[in-house]
């Protein structure tokens, strides 16, 4: 009897098990890619609604300017997120060369850096408003939010352009040290944002629950805290991935969970803010209450305590009535 026959059976069984595990992994990757696309579509819809309401139907304040820019950054990120999810979905079957990939990568970096910077700026500004309320409401420059948002967009754009010029336009191989150093600078900036965001939220929690002076819990505070929590959990994974990211030319995307998980978490991070605004704005006196999207968003970014809801609702209704009169006259 041939002694190699049992070895052949063992090898055949190991190959079947390996094929089954690889097939299951690819099926899971396929499901995660489809889920990422669905989440991105939901997030795009929510951010478009927020942009439309804050841009054309509501009076802006200091924090609504930040939220408007945050929604704009999330909208850009989700647009490219769908491109990468579709690319990852297709590459699980065969290689495809998407010429928009380089443009999508640059827009993704820009939108991601701007979005993380915006939520950090919102958290820090709210912390300053709680720490020094007199200075904030009396002596704070009127257009501070607009100036800060512009500077954050410009800084994010500069980092993105430097990444594109050094790592893509110039020869990637000969400028490896420069590209690596630039990636390190971006990661250090993300770590700074991570520390500032986490520490400012810890300071807010301490001020609210353990401070000597009673600080009221407003809906805006809840919105900021929940959004910051989602960013800390889901948002910084793609920054770590960027540090190790390397473009692989002419290769089929491997079936693994890491890349799909990063895509899924980044999509959740970018679509969370409209959902959080809808959730926070719908709660009134510990009960869910329906209303127009405009009223719900106004509640979610309300700086005053919950007892002053009636005044906010009256103002929103008056503004809505004025817009209706203008539309009828036109």
Curated annotation (Swiss-Prot):
Glycosylated at which positions? 16
What does the UniProt entry say about where the protein is found?
Membrane
Database matches in Gene3D superfamilies: Rhodopsin 7-helix transmembrane proteins
The residue ranges for the Cytoplasmic side of the membrane come to 55-62, 123-146, 199-219, 282-330
Q: Which residues cross the membrane?
A: 34-54, 63-83, 102-122, 147-167, 178-198, 220-240, 261-281
Bias (Acidic residues) ranges: 304-330
Q: According to the lineage, what is the superkingdom?
A: Eukaryota
Q: How does it sit in the membrane?
A: Multi-pass membrane protein
Question: Which residue spans belong to the Extracellular compartment?
Answer: 1-33, 84-101, 168-177, 241-260
One example of the protein's molecular function in GO is:
G protein-coupled receptor activity
Q: Residues annotated as region Disordered?
A: 302-330
Q: What does this protein do?
A: Orphan receptor. Probably involved in the function of nociceptive neurons. May regulate nociceptor function and/or development, including the sensation or modulation of pain.
Q: State the protein's name.
A: Mas-related G-protein coupled receptor member B8
């Amino acid at each position: 009897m041939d002694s190699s026959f049992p070895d052949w059976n063992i090898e055949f069984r190991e190959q079947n098990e390996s094929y089954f595990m690889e097939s299951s992994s690819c099926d899971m990757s396929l499901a995660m890619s489809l889920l990422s696309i669905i989440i991105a579509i939901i997030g795009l819809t929510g951010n478009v609604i927020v942009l439309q309401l804050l841009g054309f139907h509501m009076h802006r304040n200091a924090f609504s300017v930040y939220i408007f820019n945050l929604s704009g950054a999330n909208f850009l990120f989700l647009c490219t997120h769908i491109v990468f999810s579709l690319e990852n979905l297709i590459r699980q079957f065969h290689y495809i060369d998407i010429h928009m990939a380089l443009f999508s990568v640059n827009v993704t970096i820009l939108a991601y850096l701007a979005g993380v910077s915006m939520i950090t700026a919102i958290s820090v500004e709210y912390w300053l408003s709680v720490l020094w309320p007199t200075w904030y409401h009396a002596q704070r420059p009127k257009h501070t939010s607009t100036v800060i948002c512009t500077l954050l967009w410009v800084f994010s754009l500069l980092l993105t352009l430097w990444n594109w010029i050094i790592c893509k336009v110039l020869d990637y191989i000969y400028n490896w040290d420069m590209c690596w150093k630039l990636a390190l600078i971006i990661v250090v900036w993300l770590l700074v944002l991570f520390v500032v965001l986490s520490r400012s939220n810890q300071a807010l929690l301490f001020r609210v629950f353990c401070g000597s002076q009673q600080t009221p819990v407003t809906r805006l505070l809840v919105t900021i805290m929940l959004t910051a929590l989602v960013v800390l959990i889901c948002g910084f994974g793609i920054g770590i991935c960027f540090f190790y990211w390397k473009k692989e030319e002419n290769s089929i995307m491997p079936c693994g969970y890491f890349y799909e998980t990063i895509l899924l978490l980044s999509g959740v991070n970018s679509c969370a803010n409209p959902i959080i605004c809808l959730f926070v704005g719908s709660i009134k006196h510990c009960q869910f209450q329906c209303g127009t999207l405009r009223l719900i968003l106004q509640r979610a970014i309300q700086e005053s305590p919950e007892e002053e809801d009636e005044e906010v609702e009256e103002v929103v209704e008056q503004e809505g009535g004025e817009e209706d009169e203008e539309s009828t006259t036109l």
